[in-house]
Amino acid sequence: MIAAILTTLFFAFSAVTGQRVAVMLGGAWGNLMRLGLAAVVLGILVAILTPDAIRWPSFQWFFLSGLIGFGLGDVALFTAYERIGSRLTILLNLCLAPLFAMVLEWLWLGNGLGPRVVVCALLILAGVAMAIRPGSKSRAKVALRGRYWVGIVAAIIAGFGQGTGAVVSRKAEAVALELGASGSGITAAFQRVLAGLLFSAIAVILVRFFGSRKNWESWRSPLDRKVVPWLLGAALFGPVIGVSCFQWALQDLESGIVLAVVALTPIAMLPLARITEGDHPSRLALVGAVVAVAGVVLLNLWA
């Protein structure tokens, strides 16, 4: 249980540091720097711990999963960070991801959707509908930029990437197991991050050469003293330390219990977002967050 709790906390820290990186560097550029640093750290760990665990048949599936999850999902995630903040972005992302995953498994694998699943889905959607109400801007410590509705759509796309990428990743794990090449969570994360890094690099190129000037002219150096601590936190807390704790938790507990605990991340990060961003959600938004997270917890326990 300690590992699951640590996973929740590290994912929460990853969110608030990632949001600051998105604001300081810009969503596309900041995400590329974060994934680049994470890829270097994960690559070193894989070379030391599991150098023989990467096989081409499973790599293809992990790479596809990474394109969807770390690629499309994280580009959208950082786009949302700089528009609606970390609290609402993570709430939409983590609460909607299981719904997208269930729909894909239903269409692709033929898994049924029972009445309990439908009830949980309705709870999640009702909570999200209440939670998207903007909080007070007068006490914000970090100035958001961009249109609010664009951030909402981006967070929903991030949830799609997260959920769909997770389903494809499970397929990759099954292929790796058949090959006898099942490595650690770090090995899987490295293969997925590589794909996300490629997708993010393409996104940066498109923004730089085809986007409006205001979207890239404010990009700062990742070596800026004010940026480095936040960038290190965003790169390490999530893809490296958070994933490692997540795999540790799965070794000790049933996956449903682990996912139920991790689903509390949007609640755990409320005080963090308040401290780092000055985020003060409305009472309705708080109630909505609790309802949505409760739906996800029940879904993971019942599914």
Describe the residue ranges of each PLM region.
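Membrane-interface interhelical linkers
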Residues: 1-13, 17-29, 33-64, 75-84, ...
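Interfacial helix-capping/hinge residues at the ends of transmembrane alpha-helices
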Residues: 14-19, 27, 77-78, 89, ...
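Loop-to-transmembrane alpha-helix entry segments
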Residues: 56-57, 93, 110-139, 148-151, ...
